[in-house]
Structure formats: structure tokens, C-alpha cells
């Protein structure tokens, strides 16, 4: 009889723990960070040496380093959406190809 009591207590603790995880997972969905999915307008773009280079950039780096991010379906689910938004914000801050401006040529110092 004691063994059945211990199994029952373990089952109750497991059910309560899973319920808390489910409740927390539901509540965090209402935190809005990471779901704006805004793509500001493209101001300028680098002069690519070939269409292949542009294609390679956008395939490998463009989602985080441009304003032309293709947001995957799972970017709407917290906490994954928070991580993706953080990575995109960080990537755009470091280098954003959609705001690329060439520097004016410097005059030679005399």
C-alpha cells in the first residue's frame, strides 16, 4: 500500500509540473517582443559585382543583415521569437545592406 501511495504522489507532482510548464508557455505568448516582424524600407544597396554575389548574400546573411528578412513560421512562437528578433536586431545594427551607402572618395592629403 505504501508503494501505491508513493506512485500516486509522483504522478500528481508530474501532472502539476507539466501543467505549470504549459501555463507558463501559454502566458509568455502574450509578451509582444519578437513578433513585430517589421521590414523597414530599403534605402540603398551595395553595388554587387554579380547577381550571384547578391543571391549568395541574401541566402546566407540577408535575413539578419538587411531589411528584407524572411520571417519563418516559428518566429511567432515565444521564446523562439525573442531569440530570432534579438539576432536580427543585432545583425542589422552591425551591418545592414539595406542602408548601405558608399563613402565619398577622400581627397589626397597635400
Describe each model-derived feature in a short phrase:
Residues 11-14, 106-110:
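Metalloprotease/metallohydrolase-associated module, dominated by Zn2+-dependent proteases
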Residues 36-57:
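Electrostatic cytochrome c docking/interface patches
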Amino acid at each position: 500500500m505504501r508503494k501505491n501511495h508513493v506512485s500516486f504522489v509522483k504522478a500528481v507532482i508530474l501532472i502539476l509540473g507539466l501543467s505549470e510548464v504549459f501555463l507558463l508557455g501559454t502566458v509568455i505568448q502574450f509578451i509582444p517582443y519578437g513578433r513585430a516582424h517589421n521590414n523597414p524600407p530599403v534605402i540603398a544597396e551595395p553595388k554587387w559585382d554579380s547577381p550571384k554575389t547578391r543571391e549568395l548574400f541574401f541566402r546566407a546573411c540577408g535575413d539578419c543583415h538587411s531589411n528584407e528578412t524572411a520571417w519563418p513560421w516559428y518566429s511567432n512562437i515565444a521564446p523562439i521569437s525573442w531569440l530570432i528578433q534579438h539576432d536580427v536586431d543585432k545583425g542589422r545594427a552591425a551591418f545592414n545592406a539595406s542602408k548601405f551607402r558608399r563613402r565619398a572618395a577622400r581627397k589626397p592629403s597635400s
